[in-house]
């Protein structure tokens, strides 16, 4: 498949300058990595899912790969996505995305020999706008355990430290999470965090 998934987190939401195109045959990126656990795959999936509807379409995947500077054949990409797409769907759900990753040959994926956490940070920086990069810095402050999500307790603790009235009661914090929790998992990812903070700042202004 014409893409790179360890580098996949470079794509998704945000904007970046057009990178130099590289052919996959000469690429140092690989698409298969035993070290990519479900949590990291979820982050990649969420970055690719530009409209946050829980499905990665061919267009979203193509856009992500283009931001990575990877040349893709649209017909081949469509064929690959279709082979993992459930009947009646228009793209890949997260479980389909995991199946795609598991099916790939070990000769693909990841930066060889480099620190994966550093790679992940570099990828995000390369695709996020300055506003989003600033927001991500704030997100990391809230995400105290570094799992890529903000729990109600984490949110309450930081809001309290910042002096927001929302941090005074856990019930209010939980309502804030529910209001932006588009995938209903009871916690806040980066893109949900941006929406939540916008609403907090509007109410506080």
Swiss-Prot record:
Keywords: Allergen, Calcium, Metal-binding, Repeat. Ca(2+) 3 binds at residues 181, 183, 185, 187, 192. Ca(2+) 2 binds at residues 143, 145, 147, 149, 154. It comes from the Eukaryota. Transmembrane segments: none annotated. SMART domains: EFh. The keyword Translocase does not apply. GO terms for molecular function: calcium ion binding. Residues 1-26 are annotated as: Disordered. The gene is BETVIII. SUPFAM superfamilies: EF-hand (SSF47473). Residues 36-71, 72-107, 130-165, 168-203 form the EF-hand domain. InterPro entries: Centrin_CML-like, EF-hand-dom_pair, EF_Hand_1_Ca_BS, EF_hand_dom. This is Calcium-binding allergen Bet v 3. Could be involved in calcium metabolism in pollen. Binds 3 calcium ions. Ca(2+) 1 binds at residues 49, 51, 53, 60. CDD domains: EFh.
């Amino acid at each position: 498949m014409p893409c790179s998934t360890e580098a996949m987190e470079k794509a998704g939401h945000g904007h970046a300058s057009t990178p130099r195109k590289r052919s996959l045959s000469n690429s140092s990126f690989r698409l298969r990595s035993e070290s990519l656990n479900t949590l990291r795959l979820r982050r990649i999936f969420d970055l690719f899912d530009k409209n946050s509807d829980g499905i990665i379409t061919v267009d979203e995947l193509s856009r992500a790969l283009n931001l990575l500077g990877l040349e893709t054949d649209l017909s081949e990409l469509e064929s690959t996505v279709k082979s993992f797409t459930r009947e009646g769907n228009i793209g890949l759900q997260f479980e389909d995305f995991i199946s795609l990753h598991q099916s790939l040959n070990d000769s693909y994926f990841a930066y060889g020999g480099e620190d994966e956490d550093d790679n992940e940070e570099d990828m995000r920086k390369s695709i996020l706008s300055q506003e989003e990069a600033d927001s991500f810095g704030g997100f990391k402050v809230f995400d105290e355990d570094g799992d890529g999500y903000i729990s109600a307790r984490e949110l309450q603790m930081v809001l309290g430290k910042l002096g927001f009235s929302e941090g005074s009661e856990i019930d209010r914090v939980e309502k804030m999470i529910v209001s932006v929790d588009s995938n209903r998992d009871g916690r806040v990812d980066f893109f949900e965090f941006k929406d939540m903070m916008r609403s907090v700042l509007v109410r506080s202004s």
